From Swiss-Prot:
A Gene Ontology cellular-component term: cytoplasm
Pfam families (alphabetical): HSF_DNA-bind
Protein name according to UniProt: Heat shock factor protein 3
InterPro entries in the record: HSF_DNA-bd, WH-like_DNA-bd_sf, WH_DNA-bd_sf
Gene source species: Mus musculus (Mouse)
UniProt lineage: Eukaryota, Metazoa, Chordata, Craniata, Vertebrata
Length: 492
């Protein structure tokens, strides 16, 4: 036993050596004749008595399997007549290092390792190594992807904050741009206004009336850039605070229209030409339309006039009809217009004769005017007549301001115009004849629109607007334009 302790011998070999070397158990297990092998004489007794005591089991097959694992082999002896009976029961095993008297050799006996598993491991070692390498690469790629994902999250967060700031700046810029555009559109879409000091008092108006007019104007909606029918469709679009102004202005226009219509029907003196008709149709709210061109940003020229005593030569001034917005101004007192209408009625019988003379003179000439030449000649005619009238009046307080129509700002659309022909006949003679009547200018002053039948072939009418302007003795005057709108056949 001391020999086994010095060397590392498996317990199975140690127990087997003790059993075989014990002489007491020779009837069960013993050495062979040459000492190079051992024999199990009685298998049943060995399995029943010895195995449970030393190996904790009683299976002879398990014992034989253990011997095979340590390299022991079963010995088959030659069968003879003498030995055949002895070997029927015994089993002999042999190992090169398991010999009688040589216990030191037991340390060299090793348990066999299954070679099949080792060969399988060697075959799959290369593939396993490849798999391990690939797994390592996958792990590296995963780490890199995680790093990229973290960086992308940081970049996304930064971009989100930048986009938020840009949206705030964009909203602020949009608001600023909207305010600027509204400001510009308000400036461009505002109607022309009349300054307070433009209006002066008339001589026949009571002293208690206020000569200064408020700064009133209409605000037309921006989306209505074309003609707007005020009383029919556009009246609903006007702001509430300006509707009262319209309600006061429209009755004045109606009364003035009736007055002028009744006084503008002179009869021919020689019977050659019929009376000059004035379009005297009943004016209703639906037929009265005003066309406003909001796209013209030019403001009306300010009327500046001096008294007759200061500058008598500058009395004739051209007033652009772009000041038609003054018809929309608030009337402070209805008595002002009533006094003007009463004054026109008193002077109507004086102007009838002068209009008849002018009509007969124009009828005798029977000229064919072109529309452009007629407007130019009419302007020259009025200037000459005003100068002659001022010379005859001897510096009276009353003076006239000439209002010329502009083709861009017609109050009515598609007013029928007369075709006065292409050839201008005896133009110098006409001017000389028109200078002789002394009261032609007074006839033109008391009418807003004068219609004359110039051509015998075409019985059309043309209207000329000349507002009446009067002055007081102190030099102050007040402008009250009367714009009478005659109904036409084609309205919008």
């Amino acid at each position: 036993m001391e020999q086994f302790r010095k060397t590392m011998v498996p317990h199975f070999l140690t127990k087997l050596w003790i059993l075989v070397d014990d002489a007491v158990l020779d009837h069960v297990i013993r050495w062979g004749k040459d000492g190079h092998s051992f024999q199990i004489v009685n298998e049943e007794t060995f399995a029943r008595e010895v195995l449970p005591k030393y190996f904790k089991h009683n299976k002879i097959t398990s014992f034989i399997r253990q011997l095979n694992m340590y390299g022991s082999r079963k010995v088959f002896a030659l069968q003879t007549e003498k030995t055949s009976q002895e070997n029927k029961i015994s089993i002999e095993f042999q190992h090169p290092l398991f010999k009688r008297g040589e216990a030191c050799l037991l340390a060299n006996i090793k348990r066999k390792v299954p070679t099949i598993k080792i060969e399988g491991a060697s075959l799959y070692s290369d593939e396993f190594q490849k798999i391990v390498t690939e797994m390592q690469e996958f792990k590296d790629m995963q780490r890199k992807m995680d790093a990229k994902y973290t960086q992308m999250k940081q970049d996304y967060s930064n971009l989100y904050h930048e986009v938020t700031n840009l949206r705030k700046k964009y909203c602020a810029q949009q608001q600023l741009l909207t305010r600027v555009l509204h400001f510009i559109l308000d400036l461009m879409s505002e109607n022309h206004t009349v300054l307070k000091k433009r209006k002066r008092s008339l001589s026949f108006i009571s002293e208690d009336s206020d000569s200064e007019w408020d700064h009133q104007y209409f605000r037309i909606p921006e989306d209505k850039k074309e003609a707007m029918e005020i009383l029919k469709d556009g009246y609903e679009l006007v702001e509430d605070k300006y509707k009262s102004l319209l309600d006061r202005v429209m009755p004045i226009l109606k009364e003035s229209k009736k007055l002028i219509s009744s006084g503008d029907q002179p009869s021919g003196d020689d019977g050659e030409h019929p009376k000059v008709p004035v379009q005297d149709k009943p004016m209703n709210e639906e037929s009265l339309t005003i066309q406003l061109d909001l796209t013209i940003p030019v403001l009306p020229e300010q009327i500046t006039e001096e008294s007759v005593e200061q500058e008598p030569k500058d009395i004739s001034l051209e007033l652009d009809l772009s000041s038609q917005d003054s018809i929309l101004m608030k009337d402070k007192s209805d008595n002002l217009y009533n006094n003007i209408i009463n004054r026109d009625k008193k002077d109507m019988h004086h102007t009838e004769g002068n209009l008849l003379e002018l009509n007969s003179l124009l009828s005798r000439k029977a000229l064919n005017y072109d529309s452009d030449h007629f407007s130019e000649s009419l302007s020259l005619m009025k200037n000459e007549e005003e100068k002659s009238q001022l010379d005859l009046s001897g510096g009276k307080d009353n003076h006239m301001i000439q209002c010329m129509e502009t083709p861009e700002l017609f109050l009515l659309d598609e007013i029928p115009m007369c075709d006065f022909g292409e050839n201008l006949q005896d133009y110098d003679r006409l001017l000389e004849d028109l200078k002789n009547p002394p009261n032609v200018i007074s006839a033109l002053c008391d009418h807003d629109y004068v219609t004359s039948n110039i051509s015998t072939l075409q019985e059309d009418t043309i209207e000329n607007s000349i507002p009446q302007l009067c002055m007081e003795a102190n030099g102050e005057s007040s402008v009250f334009p009367f714009l009478i709108l005659n109904p036409v056949t084609n309205i919008f």
